[in-house]
């Protein structure tokens, strides 16, 4: 049981580190939309700017897909003989990795859009806050981590059945 706990903590720690390292990548891949302050003090953006708001979420999901697959593969390699514990460790690791990426990305900034726009002068261009706009994007990381676990366990089960020369048959009535 101690070995399972150690391996689980290792997988979880690796996930958190991967999430923290993914945040600067996420930040560098996103072009934040901007608002331009007019002479009357009103802030406006373009139609393209409105659609770019969701590029932050889409890029986060794309990075989560890659990091989740890495976490799932690492979890399988380290915990393939541990059964459901490996799946649980991969799931927790992926969720914490996603949250670490989100947290570090928001810390990198920018933030305080309302304050920045309020103190802006006419003609200034102010980027929106760097933020994730939906928590559902975190689930991409979790699902991506489960895919390698499911595929590898399916292939391992088939390999095991072919080695014994027996295929499991269902008994029908």
Name each model-derived stretch.
Residues 1-8, 31-32, 70-90, 106-113, ...:
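Cytoplasmic membrane-interface segments at the C-terminal ends of transmembrane helices
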Residues 2, 6-14, 59-63, 85-89, ...:
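Alpha-helical transmembrane segments of integral membrane proteins
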Residues 65-75, 93-96, 100:
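Alpha-helical transmembrane segments within multi-pass membrane transporters and channels
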Residues 52-67, 124-147:
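Hydrophobic alpha-helical transmembrane segments
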């Amino acid at each position: 049981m101690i070995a399972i706990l150690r391996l689980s903590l290792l997988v979880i720690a690796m996930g958190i580190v991967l999430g923290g390292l993914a945040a600067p990548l996420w930040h560098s891949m996103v072009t934040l939309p901007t608002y331009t302050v007019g002479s009357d003090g009103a802030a406006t953006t373009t139609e393209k700017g409105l659609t770019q708001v969701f590029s932050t979420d889409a890029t986060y999901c794309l990075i989560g897909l890659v990091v989740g697959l890495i976490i799932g593969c690492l979890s399988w390699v380290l915990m393939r003989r541990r059964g459901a514990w490996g799946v649980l460790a991969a799931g927790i690791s992926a969720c914490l990795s996603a949250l670490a990426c989100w947290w570090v990305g928001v810390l990198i900034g920018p933030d305080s859009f309302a304050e920045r726009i309020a103190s802006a002068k006419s003609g200034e261009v102010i980027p929106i806050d760097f933020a994730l706009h939906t928590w559902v994007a975190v689930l991409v990381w979790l699902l991506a981590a489960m895919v390698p676990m499911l595929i590898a366990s399916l292939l391992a089960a088939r390999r095991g059945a072919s080695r014994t020369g027996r295929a499991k048959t269902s008994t029908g009535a």
